[in-house]
Amino acid sequence: MAQKKGGGSTRNGRDSESKRLGVKVYGGQSILAGSIIVRQRGTRFHPGVNVGVGKDHTLFALANGKVHFSVKGALNKPTVSVVAAE
């Protein structure tokens, strides 16, 4: 009698779906108002001029223009601004 024992079970095989976080528009690139600049968890990047913050800490443009990254303050916080197009 050809037989095979039970294959057993595994406890592996799960992983969470990636959240696609990170910088979406880089320094010097043009952007339209309402477009997402950075998707992040917490305020790794802080909002500057013409940049708004969503409830999940997403940074988005409040005006058309060019994205500008800088470091500000005594704590050297990375800040994102949008220099408005004339």
UniProtKB/Swiss-Prot annotation:
Keywords per UniProt: Ribonucleoprotein, Ribosomal protein
Any single biological process term in GO: translation
A Pfam short name: Ribosomal_L27
MF term (GO), any: structural constituent of ribosome
Positions of region (Disordered): 1-20
Any one cellular-component term (Gene Ontology): cytosolic large ribosomal subunit
Compositional bias ranges of the Gly residues kind: 1-10
NCBIfam families: L27
Family per similarity comment: Belongs to the bacterial ribosomal protein bL27 family.
Protein name: Large ribosomal subunit protein bL27
Organism, as annotated: Bordetella pertussis (strain Tohama I / ATCC BAA-589 / NCTC 13251)
High-level lineage: Bacteria, Pseudomonadati, Pseudomonadota, Betaproteobacteria, Burkholderiales
